[in-house]
């Protein structure tokens, strides 16, 4: 609840769909400390899709009397992401519990694409930026998943790394299962 209730890190975004702002989609980020959440809600029956990148303007006091200026922040600023080549953003979708990975640089430069069915919501939690390993594990996993989610990032990575080893056991497993089945 604390991730949703504060105002210090709250940013509201427009969803850009086919060159226009989709007024039916509510998109915002918020957080506390280093923790961030990203929320989407489609308030219409029709499917919505598009990109978010820049927050809507918000008022900031300048400290010069009653003077106020309008500011915006990027999604990457709202999520504490940097555009370094070896940085990746991992996050978990609340409803499905699936984990996702994206290049932080892509989010910084392009924003984030979202697709929502009518009256659907998505809440991304556990958002964090990680640095790739020397053996490029996050890069390999990001390219392999290609935008799809998985139940567990570490398990998906292990399955990817050891897929050739697993393939060598398939004939033995089939043979063992057949032997068990034949003995019944």
Model-assigned labels for residue ranges:
Residues 1-184:
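Carbohydrate-interacting/catalytic domains
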